[in-house]
Amino acid sequence: MTAVGPEELRADCSRCVGICCVAPAFAASADFAIDKPAGRPCPNLRPDLRCGIHTDLRSRGFPGCTVFDCFGAGQRVTQVTFGGRDWRDDQPTAQAMFDIFTVVRPLHELLWHLTEALTMELPAPLRAALAEALAATDRLAGGDPESLRSLAVDAHRRGVVPLLAQAGDQARARGGRPGVDRRGAALLGADLRRVDLRRASLRGAQLVGADLRRVDLTGADLTGADLRGADLRGADLSGALFVHQSQLDAARGDRATGLPPRRSRPRHWAAPRRARDGSPRFPGRRPGR
């Protein structure tokens, strides 16, 4: 992994050793059916380091697993940092891999956002700063185990996040004035169907269970927005900014939901009901609205 590209920033379980099924802790909740302490393998992890219930995770009470994405950190830690070693080799190796995974994953998340920002039309000085941050972040993520374990990730993130926010603001302003600023807003369960969210800032907004049916999100910055259970049926995200696949996987949508480039329609999304004329029908909407 010598260059950062889309493939390096997407989870590839075939090149990993199931780190995300062992390293994190999770508690029994709507996202996970059981309690699991950090460092203990999930009981569903098979000897071949694949999930034994992968195709049934949602129905078996593990939707949290379906929306987790390591941004390619798992295979980098496995194949590059540890040269293909396995956490089962010995306890010191296991602990080191788990510790370093928690460092490399946020770095890879930054790499994904930086890469995404560099696809936008931005002023040359900002593009140069983003490219420099991308290279610096990749160098850090490619460090040896000792340097990674001592790395101050939060300090590095604090230097990068303002650049990403600036990129989002510049992109939102293209084609007109920026929209409403709701960054960090608590919008849990909110009915936003009649709110103009074009070119809005929804960075870090809590949109859990929000009703966004048929909402136009063109130019909206969704960096880090929590879309768990949000209703995106018929919404247009084709021109939204910084939408990660895991956000879509956590939401509800249908075939009428417009997706950004290079994103896949989650398999659990429902097909829209059809009116007699063949057009999509949306619950809660009267004809012509």
Predicted regions, residues:
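Hydrophobic scaffolds flanking metal-cofactor catalytic centers in soluble metalloenzymes
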Residues: 1-152, 156-159, 163-173
